[in-house]
Regions:
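A structural signal for small-residue-enriched, beta-sheet-centric alpha/beta enzyme cores
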Residues: 3-157
Length: 157
């Protein structure tokens, strides 16, 4: 999510962003969180740190993963941050994982989350995911190659 149109110099300003998420499996809570961002939190290092983009990917596994699988998934997710701007963190949930992005690039956030989704599907023995059609087409090149798309790669399509 991008807070404001930064290319136009816009940010949340005097506004307030509130979000609440609760995920339950049976009688057990897997995730419960609330987020409220106002002007002060936009610039605080424990808030947005002056960055306009935030995102969260939560995966609740259908069955508990073997510790080796979870370790491989988390280490791979950390390696997938290579070459991307922003602050990215990934950790284990019982069972599953949570990944968060905070930075200046919605493209970097989408790419990292797509890389993670590809790893999650591989762990489950599922096919390679398709690149979402609503995302800019040049990002499909980035999903397979961490190098930035160039004019040559986007016009060759």
């Amino acid at each position: 999510m991008r807070l404001g149109r930064t290319a136009r110099g816009e940010d949340l300003g005097a506004g307030r962003f509130c979000n609440s998420l609760s995920i339950r499996r049976g009688e057990q809570w897997a995730v419960v969180e609330r987020l409220s961002l106002e002007q002060e939190q936009l610039h605080h290092p424990h808030g947005m740190g002056g960055e306009p983009v935030l995102g969260t990917l939560i995966w609740i596994a259908p069955e508990p993963l073997a510790s080796e699988q979870l370790t491989e998934l988390l280490e791979g997710g950390r390696a997938d941050r290579e070459g991307l701007s922003g602050t990215m963190a990934i950790g284990a949930l019982e069972p599953g994982l949570i990944a968060r992005y905070r930075g200046g690039s919605s493209q970097a956030a989408r790419l990292w989350f797509f890389r993670l989704w590809r790893r999650i599907r591989a762990v489950q023995g599922l096919s390679e995911p398709s690149w979402p059609r609503t995302w800019p087409f040049q990002e499909a090149d980035l999903a397979l190659n961490p190098e930035p798309a160039t004019a040559a790669t986007t016009t060759a399509r």
